C-alpha cells in the first residue's frame, strides 16, 4: 500500500513535467495543474448551473413560484469563492511540502525520462518524416482527381468518390503500418522506463525501507495538517449556506401555500 501511495505521488508530481518533456513548454507545478483544472471545472459548473436557474426563473412556473433562486445562487457562488480563497494557501503549503519530500526521487525519474527521450527521438522523427511522405503522396494522387471533378462537375462526383475510396484506404493502411512499426520500436523503451520506476521503488522499499516509511508518514502528516487548517473555512461555508438554505425553504413553503390557496379557491 505504501508503494502504491508513493507511486501515485511520484507520477502526479512528475506528471507536471510531461508536457514540458514532449512539447518543450514551461513546466507547470502540480498545484498549478490541480488549481487550473479545479477552477475550470467549478467555473463551468457554476456558469452552467446559473444559466439553468435563470431559465427556470424566466419560465411561467418560475415567475409564479417566485423562489428567488438566482439571488440564492449568487449568494452560494460568493460563499464558495470565499472558501476557495481561504483553502488555497493551505493546499499550496501541502503540495510544497510533498514536493520537497520527493525531490530526490523526482530528479532521478527526470533523468530516466530524459535518457529515454534521447533514445526514442530518432524513431519519432522517422515516423513524422514517413507520415509527411505518405500525406504528400496521397495529395499528389488526389490532385488530378480534383481537376477532373472541376471539369466534369456534378456528374462525375460519384465516379470521383469511387476513385478516392481506395486511395483513402491505402493511406489508412500505410499509416496503420507505420504506427504499428513505431509502437514496436518504442515498446522496449516503455518497458525499460516501467522497470526503472519499479526498481527505484523496490530500492526504496528494500534498501531504504525507513525512507519509504518516512515518505508515507510525512504525507499522512501533511494531509492531517491540511484537514485541520481547512476546518475553519469549511465551517464558514456551512454557516454561509444556512441563510441561503433557510431563505430557499421559506420561499418554497410560501409558494406552495399560495398555490394551495389558489387551488382551494377555484
UniProtKB/Swiss-Prot annotation:
Signal sequence segment: 1-18
Transport found in the keyword field: yes
Each Sequence repeat, start to end: 67-88, 89-110, 111-121, 122-143, 144-165, 166-187, 188-209, 210-231, 232-242, 243-266
Record-level GO cellular component terms: chylomicron; extracellular vesicle; high-density lipoprotein particle; low-density lipoprotein particle; very-low-density lipoprotein particle
Region (10 X approximate tandem repeats), start-end ranges: 67-266
Principal cellular location given in the protein's record: secreted
Subcellular location per the Swiss-Prot or TrEMBL entry: Secreted
Post-translational modification: Glycosylated.
Gene Ontology terms: biological process: acylglycerol homeostasis; cholesterol efflux; cholesterol metabolic process; lipoprotein metabolic process; phospholipid efflux
Methionine sulfoxide: residues bearing it: 109
Alphabetically ordered keywords of this record: Cholesterol metabolism, Glycoprotein, HDL, Lipid metabolism, Lipid transport, Lipoprotein, Oxidation, Palmitate, Phosphoprotein, Repeat, Secreted, Signal, Steroid metabolism, Sterol metabolism, Transport
The keyword Magnesium appears for this protein: no
Molecular functions (GO terms): cholesterol transfer activity; phosphatidylcholine-sterol O-acyltransferase activator activity; phospholipid binding; protein homodimerization activity
Family, similarity comment: Belongs to the apolipoprotein A1/A4/E family.
Subunit field text: Homodimer. Interacts with APOA1BP and CLU. Component of a sperm activating protein complex (SPAP), consisting of APOA1, an immunoglobulin heavy chain, an immunoglobulin light chain and albumin. Interacts with NDRG1. Interacts with SCGB3A2. Interacts with NAXE and YJEFN3.
PANTHER family: APOLIPOPROTEIN, APOLIPOPROTEIN A-I
Annotated function: Participates in the reverse transport of cholesterol from tissues to the liver for excretion by promoting cholesterol efflux from tissues and by acting as a cofactor for the lecithin cholesterol acyltransferase (LCAT). As part of the SPAP complex, activates spermatozoa motility.
Protein name: Apolipoprotein A-I
Species name: Mirounga angustirostris (Northern elephant seal)
Designated gene of the protein: APOA1
